[in-house]
Amino acid sequence: MTQQAAEVAKRRTFAIISHPDAGKTTITEKLLLMGKAIAVAGTVKSRKSDRHATSDWMEMEKQRGISITTSVMQFPYREHMINLLDTPGHEDFSEDTYRTLTAVDSALMVLDGGKGVEPRTIALMDVCRLRDTPIVSFINKLDRDIRDPIELLDEIEAVLKIKAAPITWPIGCYRDFKGVYHLAGDYIIVYTPGHGHERTETKIIEKLDSAEARAHLGDEYERFIEQLELVQGACHEFNQQEFLDGQLTPVFFGTALGNFGVDHVLDAVVDWAPLPLARVANERSVAPQEEKFSGFIFKIQANMDPKHRDRIAFMRICSGKYEKGMKMRHVRTGKDVRIGDALTFFSSEREQLEEAYAGDIIGLHNHGTIQIGDTFTEGEALGFTGIPHFAPELFRRVRLKDPLKSKQLRQGLQQLAEEGATQVFFPERSNDIILGAVGVLQFDVVASRLKEEYKVECSYEPITVWSARWIECSDKKKLEEFSNKAVENLALDGGGHLTYLAPTRVNLALMEERWPDVKFRATREHH
C-alpha cells in the first residue's frame, strides 16, 4: 500500500446533525476529548449566563475575529485521523449547514431522548438522503427522563424512513440509569458519570445471564430481559452494507454530559463508516487514492470582524496530496495559483498546514475570487457535482434607504450570493429585489455586510412567498407557454436561472399538477 493510500485509509470525515438543544455542542467537546484535542471540556453553561454554548477556546477564536474551529476539527483517535465538521445549530442555521453535508462521507445524528425526532433533524436528514450518506445515531440525555426507547426507534423508522438497528440498549434512565447492554457482544457497560474532562474508566460486566449482571440490575432484571426479547424480535439487525448504502442506522444510547456512550459512537465511525469515497465530477469519477490533487469548495466563511477582510474558503480534498507552496489550477477562472498558507483545523488551533490528504478539509484565504462549488486541481479541467443550492425557506423584499445606491446594492448582493451568504431573486414583473434564506440570521448578516463592505443601508419587508423552485423544461414551446401563464410569479436568481416563487404550498402543488412537463426543482447545482 502506498503512503498515500495508507493515509486515505486512516481518514474518517463526518458531520454531526441534530435539532438545537439535543446536545450537539457537548458531544463535540467529548469527541475532542476522546482525541485529546482539548485537555478540558468546557461545560456548556446555562443560557442565561452564557448566550453562546461554546467552550472557552471557541470563545477565544471569536475574539480573534473568526470563529473557525467551530466549523472543522481534526483529531487523532485509534490510529485514525478524524475530521469532524460541525453544522451550525441555533440562529446561525443557514444554507451552509446543508452544504457542509455534501463534504462528508458519513454523519452522526444526535437525538434528544426526551423529544425524539425534531424538525431540524428531518430537514438535515433529507439532505443526507440526496447522497445516501451513512448515518450513525446517538440517543442522548439518558441521565434525564426519556421516552420509551422502542417508541424512539419506531419514530426514527417512520419519520426518517430509515431502518434502525440498536447496537446498545439502555438499562433504566434518569436517576436509575445503570448503563447499556451491548446486544451483539452480550455485555453490560456500566454507567459511572464523568463530567467535564474526566475520562472515567469503563467497567464491563460480561454475559447478561451472569450473577454479576443480575446483581447490577437488581429488581429490574426480569423486566429488562422481557424488554430485550421484544427488542430482538422486533428490531433490525445491523448490516454493514445497508448502513453504507444509507438504508440503515446503527443506534447507540448514552449521555454526552455524563461522558457516557460517546466513545461507542466514535468507535462505530472508525470501524464501520466509509473512508473517503470517490467523488463524481462532470467529466469522470475521481478516486481518493489518485496521485494528482483535486478538491472542491463547499463553504465560504465571511469574517464577522470588519477589521479583517479575509474570508476562508473551505475545501474538501478529493484526491492526491496537498503540500505547502504547491501550485493549483482554479478551474473556473483557468488561473494557476500557488497556495502557501492553507489552514488546517487541528484541535483548537488554526495552523499553517504542511500536508493534507483526501478526506481532509483545508482553509484557503479568499479575497473575493473563490465561489462555492469551485474546483481546484493540478491542471485537469474537472467540475465536481453534488454541491447544490437549496430552495430558501424564508423570504424578504429589500428596500434601499438611499435610492441612488441601487447599483452598489445589486453588486453587493451578487457578491454575497456567490459566496453563499444569501440567495437573491429578481422578479420578472417588478423592480423588486427578493432575498431568500434558510435561517433568519442570514438576513441580519447580509444587512450588516452590505453596510460595512458596500456602504449600502437597507431594510426588509415581508413578502408572500412560501418557497422557490428552479424551473427546468426540455420542451421549449411548453416552457414558453408556462412562462407566459406564470409570469407574475417568475424571477431570475443571482445566476440568471428561471425560478418560480410559489406564494403558498397549495399553489405549488396545483402548478406541478397543471404543468407535468415542467420540473420544479428544490435544489440546483452550482455551475
UniProtKB/Swiss-Prot annotation:
GO MF entries: GTP binding; GTPase activity; guanosine tetraphosphate binding; translation release factor activity, codon nonspecific; translation release factor activity, codon specific
tr-type G domain boundaries: 9-277
CDD domains reported for this sequence: RF3 (cd04169), RF3_II (cd03689), RF3_III (cd16259)
Protein's cellular compartments: Cytoplasm
Binding site for GTP: 18-25, 86-90, 140-143
Region forming the signal peptide: none
Pfam family, one: GTP_EFTU
A single cellular component GO annotation: cytosol
The UniProt record lists the keyword Nucleotide-binding: yes
Function: Increases the formation of ribosomal termination complexes and stimulates activities of RF-1 and RF-2. It binds guanine nucleotides and has strong preference for UGA stop codons. It may interact directly with the ribosome. The stimulation of RF-1 and RF-2 is significantly reduced by GTP and GDP, but not by GMP.
NCBIfam families with a match to the protein in the record: prfC (TIGR00503), PRK00741.1 (NF001964), small_GTP (TIGR00231)
Record-stated family: Belongs to the TRAFAC class translation factor GTPase superfamily. Classic translation factor GTPase family. PrfC subfamily.
Protein name: Peptide chain release factor 3
Source species of the chain: Pseudomonas fluorescens (strain ATCC BAA-477 / NRRL B-23932 / Pf-5)
Gene that produces this protein: prfC
